[in-house]
């Protein structure tokens, strides 16, 4: 979709593609912004991209779903591949390089607003600064998940960039430093008490993304605290089974338990493209191991009919969204890793009651035995899967199918390797492919910038 974008920035910035250069802004005959309204045009461009479904970098869009679901194992590429739908991460490296570069352009825009409006006491300034901190924090979270290895605090992180310096050559630092920096960005956004929905990133949306950050970085105490806060105080409730299909397949509305989503503008000029994208995704059936999670009577689980047709092809709206059910699933897993197994199971059952008609609560004694043919065989700590954790993973896979989650679950839990056959050739997803490479031009410009393992140029 990149060739379809029409950038209509009110301000023109001159930038280069390297990390050091494209974060620098050099006015060339342009009026430097001064008023709140002039700075607002920078952030509103980014917000409009989210609402119209053009944004791939903050909340994400259908293109991002197509990539993540195509390269994961939710769809069975061994049965059917398509030239219109990704199937192997190794074929997508060039696209991920574009994602890396374009993400930094958004960081640049956020830094412009933060650097010039922070401290102004107008409601417009505070709204813009809060949104900028939130967007920048989400970009860093996304970059960490895609361009860093699975969480290990001393491994390389993402360069930390606060201002514009054409001579700057920031190093990657560590993942712990990236986590602490990103957490601080979210805290700065929350400190401004954002409530205006025109800036999209209100308090509960920011807290949800902060919970996702804590979850990725395995800070289970923080996950428990934030998720309980959202569940208890946000006013959002798990969508009941009777309303699930309407909520999950709403074309452009934010319904029920959805805290935030992309593509809420139903008059987007890209709607024709999204229609094609949905058709591309529906050219590959769901894999049998996903389908079997719905049991002998899949029609009792409302997620099944809302996700698949009779031939296992996708019918679920492929949108990037953040929902309360994800908070519940993160909470269950956090309790599990803290050793509070009963609380973990309670939340699994709470979700099941809102998804499966006539659901019977699971107990420790009735949890199914661990399946030996699953792709994920160890958790994020390298420990063997248990029946309870398998139940959490099963609900997560069913719940967040076609929302871009499975690829990162595979990465987070052991980076299993597997292969698909296409046109008589075998394509193997190696462990290193779960982490995209840092842009080569940045490595060439800054020899101190460490490349990710597995990539040589």
Where are these regions (language model features)?
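Active-site core of glycosidic bond-cleaving carbohydrate-active enzymes
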Residues: 261, 271-272, 278-293
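Acidic/polar-rich alpha-helix caps and helix-coil junctions
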Residues: 3, 19-60, 92-272, 294-457
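Short alpha-helical hairpin
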Residues: 67-91, 298, 302
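Bacterial N-terminal signal peptides that target proteins for export
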Residues: 1-8
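Transmembrane alpha-helical insertion/packing segments
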Residues: 61-65
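The N-terminal extracellular segments of secreted preproproteins, especially immediately downstream
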Residues: 15-18, 70
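Bacterial N-terminal signal peptides
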Residues: 8-16
């Amino acid at each position: 979709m990149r060739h379809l974008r029409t950038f209509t920035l009110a301000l023109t910035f001159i930038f280069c593609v390297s990390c050091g250069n494209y974060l620098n802004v050099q006015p060339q005959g342009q009026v430097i912004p001064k008023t709140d309204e002039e700075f607002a045009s920078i952030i509103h461009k980014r917000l409009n991209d989210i609402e119209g479904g053009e944004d791939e970098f903050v909340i994400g869009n259908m293109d991002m779903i197509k990539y993540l679901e195509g390269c994961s194992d939710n769809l069975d590429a061994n049965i059917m591949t398509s030239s219109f739908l990704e199937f192997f991460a190794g074929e997508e490296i060039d696209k991920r390089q574009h994602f890396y570069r374009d993400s930094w352009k958004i960081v640049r825009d956020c830094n412009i607003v933060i650097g010039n409006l922070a401290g102004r006491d107008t409601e417009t300034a505070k709204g813009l600064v809060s949104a900028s901190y939130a967007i920048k924090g989400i970009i860093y979270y996304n970059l960490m998940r895609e361009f860093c290895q699975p969480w290990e605090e001393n491994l390389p992180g993402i360069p930390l960039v606060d201002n514009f310096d054409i001579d700057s050559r920031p190093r990657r630092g560590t993942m712990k430093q990236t986590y602490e920096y990103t957490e601080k960005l979210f805290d700065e956004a929350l400190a401004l008490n954002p409530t205006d929905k025109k800036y999209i990133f209100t308090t509960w949306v920011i807290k949800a993304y902060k919970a996702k950050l804590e979850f990725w970085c395995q800070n289970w105490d923080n996950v428990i605290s934030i998720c309980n806060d959202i569940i208890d105080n946000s006013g959002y409730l798990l969508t009941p089974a009777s309303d699930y299909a309407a909520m999950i397949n709403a074309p452009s509305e934010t319904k029920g338990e959805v805290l935030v989503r992309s593509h809420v503008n139903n008059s987007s000029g890209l709607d024709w493209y999204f229609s094609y994208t949905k058709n591309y995704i529906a050219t590959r059936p769901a894999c049998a191991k996903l389908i079997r999670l719905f049991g002998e009577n899949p029609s009792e689980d409302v997620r099944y009919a809302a996700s698949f047709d009779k031939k296992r092809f996708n019918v679920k709206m492929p949108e990037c969204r953040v929902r309360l059910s994800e908070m519940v699933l993160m909470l269950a897993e956090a309790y599990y890793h803290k050793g509070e197994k009963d609380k973990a199971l309670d939340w699994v059952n709470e979700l099941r009651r809102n998804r499966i008609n006539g659901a019977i609560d699971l107990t420790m004694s009735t949890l199914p035995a661990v399946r030996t043919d699953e792709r994920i065989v160890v958790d994020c700590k390298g420990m063997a899967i248990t029946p309870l954790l398998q139940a959490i993973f099963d609900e997560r896979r069913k719940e967040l199918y076609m929302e871009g989650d499975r690829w990162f679950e595979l990465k987070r839990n052991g980076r299993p390797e597997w292969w698909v056959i296409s046109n008589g050739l075998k394509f193997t997803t190696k462990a290193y492919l779960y982490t995209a490479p840092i842009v080569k031009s940045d490595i060439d410009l800054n020899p101190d910038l460490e490349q990710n393992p597995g990539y040589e140029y």
